[in-house]
Curated annotation (Swiss-Prot):
Belongs to the ABC transporter superfamily. Xylose importer (TC 3.A.1.2.4) family. This is Xylose import ATP-binding protein XylG. Residues 5-242, 259-505 form the ABC transporter domain. It is found in: Cell inner membrane. It comes from Shigella flexneri serotype 5b (strain 8401). Part of the ABC transporter complex XylFGH involved in xylose import. Responsible for energy coupling to the transport system. GO terms for cellular component: plasma membrane. The keyword Translocase applies.
Amino acid sequence: MPYLLEMKNITKTFGSVKAIDNVSLRLNAGEIVSLCGENGSGKSTLMKVLCGIYPHGSYEGEIIFAGEEIQASHIRDTERKGIAIIHQELALVKELTVLENIFLGNEITHNGIMDYDLMTLRYQKLLAQVSLSISPDTRVGDLGLGQQQLVEIAKALNKQVRLLILDEPTASLTEQETSVLLDIIRDLQQHGIACIYISHKLNEVKAISDTICVIRDGQHIGTRDAAGMSEDDIITMMVGRELTALYPNEPHTTGDEILRIEHLTAWHPVNRHIKRVNDISFSLKRGEILGIAGLVGAGRTETIQCLFGVWPGQWEGKIYIDGKQVDIRNCQQAIAQGIAMVPEDRKRDGIVPVMAVGKNITLAALNKFTGGISQLDDAAEQKCILESIQQLKVKTSSPDLAIGRLSGGNQQKAILARCLLLNPRILILDEPTRGIDIGAKYEIYKLINQLVQQGIAVIVISSELPEVLGLSDRVLVMHEGKLKANLINHNLTQEQVMEAALRSEHHVEKQSV
């Protein structure tokens, strides 16, 4: 039986740089292939070639789909063949309804007039295929990210898709939403729809894939049956070396208490009757990594936003630093107290995409380069930028390159570099490795370990429980705004953390002082 897709010896160059070099990929109808590789490995370039974003003639090699050679000059050409790609940044118009988004560019018309009755019937069938039950008149912007992802798939199904490409589809989804999405992909597989799945979450890759294809530095490293590969095997192929331990296990000593929060309560910014954080208290020691775990809506991000002075609603409670009560109502006051934060959404809150990498790094510490006068010392700033880029191993062709052009991992390193310029005593990391590759994760984990060895106290919030457990000395477990447990991390398991989150009573393990 012929393959549904064959990409043969694809090479794509940008100037003198080969982004992909003689890469081949093939898959059958109904097969799920995961495409793995670090950021910058060439995965996205290969998919852009496949989808016609890079048109025929701009690359070398051959693409055969359903027995015919594709020579696409535009993405619409491949869509007509039955190839659809869903990017991590969803391509939905949030002001339009769900129905309007699904049929956008593919409207059903009769004598030049849109036939809403036929579109509604088709809409109901499409949503049933992705297990959604939403009014066609619902505005897409009112949906959660998980539902928006499924609307994108329904939109692809409306184009008679035969090959669905999913690029980091679960980066912003909860575990429950991820589980629903994977079930739908498996169901589509039963109907003969093939899938190329791109993700840094190797547990998902293992769970969903028939085969796994690894690309490194633009070259095809290998394609193997998923059943015969461990996560360590995938990592070794991706990075070209064996990572003996993803989470550094170097000993570090905790010191005296540096932070204490007492009876913190935060209200919803609009509805004062809803408590997003409900009377929680905890402490943090110098050189300690404190993890905060919990399901979506637990109040984790709200808690640290209060600490950093950026929670948009009202809150009350007491914050003590070095035993002295402090008042923090904005980020400037937090920074003055030695607190720095890497935000949850780096694209929205962490970077200025069109600004240079270097300027993003020094953005919060410009006073370091003024020397008491209003004019910047450009030489001192440039020296600091180059040192920060080297220290954090930020991969950029130039400090003057717009930071929006860097990979997610390198953007995150630049944000960390900015935080370290503030000489923080307390560093808050909210989803520090979301959407970044395994190699960049490893480097960030090593950096965190180095910081606590210097006595910096670190708070880590992550939706990935293995990350929380792999990094933290102690774990706070939150659920629906309440602190449910304060657990010393002596080989804690994910099951113990989830049990603590969902049990009715509050549980605290006493710490040795």
